[in-house]
Amino acid sequence: MKLVSFDAFRTLRLPETHYIKPELFFTHLADLREADWVLFPEYWQINPLVFGLKRRIFPSLASYLIGHNKIEMTRAFMAVAPEHVPWTLTAPNDPTSAERLWQQMALPFVAKIPKSSMGEGVFLIESQDDWQRYLKLTPSLYVQEWLPIDRDLRIIWIGDRVIGGFWRRQSDQGFHNNLSRGGRIDHSPLPEAAVALVHRLATALDINHAGFDIAMVDGYPFVLEFNRLFGNRGLGSLNNDIPGVILDYLERQSGCNDPDDDPLRPTPIWPVAI
């Protein structure tokens, strides 16, 4: 396989992978046209790669499109597993919509900025003052019911399977479980119900590289979001396994669509006489 990468860090240990700096995209079109897979392109490169050059990308197109915006992500989750999505309301950020959502939500509730990560755009709303501060920061309104939890799960999905994960305990400052916001790692076993939900969502939505955040409420899993580019903290020795898992997945996907690899219906060397 000919592999081209736009992320040197995430593909460092993948064999025979040609790294290209993202800003040099258009000076390496010949290399890209010859690639079997283009790995970890930046979001702005997706349209020219997929629709212009007809290249296969990893992570998948769905991983990029769904993972780019929390509102779109939640809508996708609600289409395939609505019973596992916290009660959510979205609206434009205008005075009428803001007042309507404020009246509909019971305190406390959670408000999010649609394009944010690492817990930076997630707020616990406990008062009108909290709500007004949030309204000044977000282009669109995205609110969810507050779940009574003091930890959540980060479950890692690569290719077509769960490779591991860990619990994230709430930070000493409260509310946020993100490691970047003071959350603590706990390597207690992953609940089977949470793993099964990740498998269901990722398979249904064609996601092949993500860290899913799952909340458990009385043993029942709720999906919060996923991150296409997840951090490596908390993964321990799994970090050593990831390159091999990616390579195995790419090889299997390539084989599935290569007629020369089909022993029952191989591509003829010469035209078949009729």
PLM region spans:
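Protein kinase-like catalytic core scaffold
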Residues: F109, G164, A210, F222-E225
